[in-house]
């Protein structure tokens, strides 16, 4: 399958690196994604991560707008000004840079969250809170049947 699914929390090592979960690395390999486009998410305190196709999708949306419109300018500010390219090291680790830490509040652990065509980097407690809020908004209870 070529989708990013599930969520996994991994610890950041002493050098500021975190291992990307194996299933996520497998999707990256199958899609032949060498360079990761990382974007400060528009709705959540998370970093959205995908291949160049993620950036291209946003750029197509911007190109469909009037280039001088406030909407196109705002979108470009978010997509280009809030994005960077990163690469995994040979062991499949990602450097948790200030770009990631300052936007998300991540300090010692990262929760990787699958979002189908991309994944996100979250501070673990922020992810749990957002997930609980999403469930509550859909009428789901956190309680499990006995």
Curated annotation (Swiss-Prot):
Its main location: cytoplasm. Pfam families: MraZ. Keywords: Cytoplasm, DNA-binding, Repeat, Transcription, Transcription regulation. CDD domains: MraZ_C, MraZ_N. One of its GO terms (cellular component) is cytoplasm. GO terms for molecular function: DNA-binding transcription factor activity; transcription cis-regulatory region binding. The keyword S-adenosyl-L-methionine does not apply. Belongs to the MraZ family. This is Transcriptional regulator MraZ. It comes from Agrobacterium fabrum (strain C58 / ATCC 33970).
